[in-house]
Every structure is written in structure tokens, then in C-alpha cells.
């Protein structure tokens, strides 16, 4: 009798057939330390039929790249909004941020941003010619002399 009482029940696993408490699920985004949804990007990769197979790290890497690009564009657009004394980013600020940055401008060269406008640019040929130092001295000399009386 004592031997049967001394034996204990088998320990329960973490979920599964033996029941017991389940572990709280942790998303792939949290594991990777990202804000962008890794699971959703994996689903889009599968649904899009871009390849027959892809590795388990591919959606994580893609989510990290997209998150980095979004953070970069938003930081530059926020700076553009602050320069214009605005608290809200609008399409104009996005356009200015992308076109003024060399690398982002090259990446998004063929992209049209709705309501973004264009970069302010005046061709140097159309600008008024700057007066040289000699012509400005001649103007000063003629301005200081009194006109001759006729």
C-alpha cells in the first residue's frame, strides 16, 4: 500500500495531450523585436506565389527591412513638417523628405506621391544676373557725385 501511495502522478506537460496550463503564445514579431507583422508578411509571401518555397527567416528579414524604410521616411517627413511649423505629416512633407534624400530619391525615383507637389527649383539661367564688384563700384561712384548743372 505504501508503495502505491508513494508513486506520484506523472507531471503534466505544457499543453498537448496531457492537458495542463498552456504557455502564452508569443508572436514572431515580438520574438524578432519588430513592430511590423511577421506572420502577415509570411502569409502575403505564400499567397503571392513569388516562389515555390521560402525560408523561415525570409518574412522576418522582409519585415525588418520594411520597418527600417518606414522609420527612415517618417523621420525625414517629421523633420520636414517641423521645418514648416506643422505638427502633422502630410503628403507634401513625405514628398519633400523623399526627394531631398539622395538614396530614397533614387529608390523611389519613378513613384508619384498624390498631393505631394514638386521640389521647388528655378533654373539658374532664369535667375537675375549678379552684378560684379567693378560694376557695383561704378554705380556707387556715380551715385555719390552731384549731377552737373547745365
From Swiss-Prot:
MF term (GO), any = structural constituent of chromatin
Compositional bias (Low complexity): 1-12
Regions of biased composition (Polar residues) lie at 131-150
Q: How is it modified after translation?
A: Not ubiquitinated.
Tell me, in one coarse class, where this protein mainly resides: nucleus
- Which Gene Ontology biological process is one annotated for this entry? heterochromatin organization
Q: Which InterPro entries did the record assign?
A: Histone-fold, Histone_H2A, Histone_H2A/H2B/H3, Histone_H2A_C, Histone_H2A_CS
**Keywords attached to this entry:** Chromosome, DNA-binding, Nucleosome core, Nucleus, Phosphoprotein
Ranges for region Disordered: 1-28, 130-150
Q: What SUPFAM superfamilies does the record point to? A: Histone-fold
Q: Please state where this protein is localized.
A: Nucleus; Chromosome
Gene Ontology cellular component list: heterochromatin; nucleolus; nucleosome; plastid
Q: Which CDD domains match?
A: HFD_H2A
Read off the Pfam families from this record: Histone, Histone_H2A_C
Q: SMART domains in the record, alphabetically?
A: H2A
Task: Please verify whether the record's keywords include Acetylation.
Answer: no
Residues spanning the membrane: none
State the domain notes.
Answer: Contains one SPKK motif which may interact with the minor groove of A/T-rich DNA sites. Phosphorylation of this motif may regulate DNA binding. This motif is reiterated in both termini of histone H1 and in the N-terminus of sea urchin histones H2B, but its presence in the C-terminus seems to be unique to plant H2A.
Q: Function, please?
A: Core component of nucleosome. Nucleosomes wrap and compact DNA into chromatin, limiting DNA accessibility to the cellular machineries which require DNA as a template. Histones thereby play a central role in transcription regulation, DNA repair, DNA replication and chromosomal stability. DNA accessibility is regulated via a complex set of post-translational modifications of histones, also called histone code, and nucleosome remodeling.
Q: Which family does it belong to?
A: Belongs to the histone H2A family.
What is the protein's quaternary organization? The nucleosome is a histone octamer containing two molecules each of H2A, H2B, H3 and H4 assembled in one H3-H4 heterotetramer and two H2A-H2B heterodimers. The octamer wraps approximately 147 bp of DNA.
This protein's name = Probable histone H2A.5
> What is the originating organism of this protein?
Arabidopsis thaliana (Mouse-ear cress)
Amino acid at each position: 500500500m505504501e508503495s502505491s501511495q508513494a508513486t506520484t502522478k506523472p507531471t503534466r506537460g505544457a499543453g498537448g495531450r496531457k492537458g495542463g496550463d498552456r504557455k502564452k503564445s508569443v508572436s514572431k514579431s515580438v520574438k524578432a523585436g519588430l513592430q511590423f507583422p511577421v506572420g502577415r508578411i509570411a502569409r502575403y509571401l505564400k499567397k503571392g506565389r513569388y516562389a515555390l518555397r521560402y525560408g523561415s527567416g525570409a518574412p522576418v528579414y522582409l519585415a525588418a527591412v520594411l520597418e527600417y524604410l518606414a522609420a527612415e521616411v517618417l523621420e525625414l517627413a517629421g523633420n520636414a513638417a517641423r521645418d514648416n511649423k506643422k505638427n502633422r505629416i502630410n503628403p507634401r512633407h513625405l514628398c519633400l523628405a523623399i526627394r531631398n534624400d539622395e538614396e530614397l530619391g533614387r529608390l523611389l525615383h519613378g513613384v508619384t506621391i498624390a498631393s505631394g507637389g514638386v521640389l521647388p527649383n528655378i533654373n539658374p539661367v532664369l535667375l537675375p544676373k549678379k552684378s560684379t564688384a567693378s560694376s557695383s563700384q561704378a554705380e556707387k561712384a556715380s551715385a555719390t557725385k552731384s549731377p552737373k548743372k547745365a
